[in-house]
């Protein structure tokens, strides 16, 4: 095989690896999680648990969108939607109930589980579960000036 052909094959393999990496990391993160959290058994309200932010028009996260955020300065400046913040809290609470892992695995599995929750639960289920787990109270205590986050 000629050198040019080998170079093109190398480029194609490299690009395919880069394109597939977020999805593979997502699947790896999900395999590190024992079970999946269950949504709360409540009547859906459709309102964010911690704010009055409406839940219409939210697009679920996916691994590629999550990675792309790190390269878009405008997105990095925007506030994270409440539904994603609540999904992260639900994922974190679920992982706290499992045997401890090292930090890299914990971050990978919490990110993967957050993505999974936004894809498989409705925004109302996320809000109701966050309300049931009392995340609003915990979140607001950390935001209060002079609260636990102050050093």
Residue spans for each PLM region:
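Juxtamembrane regions of bacterial inner-membrane/periplasmic proteins
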Residues: 2-151
């Amino acid at each position: 095989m000629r050198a040019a052909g080998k170079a093109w094959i190398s480029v194609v393999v490299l690009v395919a690896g880069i394109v597939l990496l977020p999805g593979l990391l997502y699947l790896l993160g999900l395999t590190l999680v024992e079970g999946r959290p269950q949504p709360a058994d409540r009547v859906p309200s459709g309102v964010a648990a911690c704010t009055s932010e409406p839940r219409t028009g939210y697009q679920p996260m996916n691994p590629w969108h999550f990675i792309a955020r790190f390269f878009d300065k405008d997105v990095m400046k925007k506030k994270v939607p409440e539904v994603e913040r609540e999904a992260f809290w639900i994922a974190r609470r679920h992982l706290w109930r499992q045997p401890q892992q090292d930090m890299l695995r914990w971050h990978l599995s919490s990110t993967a589980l957050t993505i999974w929750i936004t894809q498989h639960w409705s925004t109302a289920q996320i809000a109701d579960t966050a309300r049931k787990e009392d995340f609003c109270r915990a979140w607001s205590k950390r935001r209060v000036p002079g609260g636990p986050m102050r050093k």
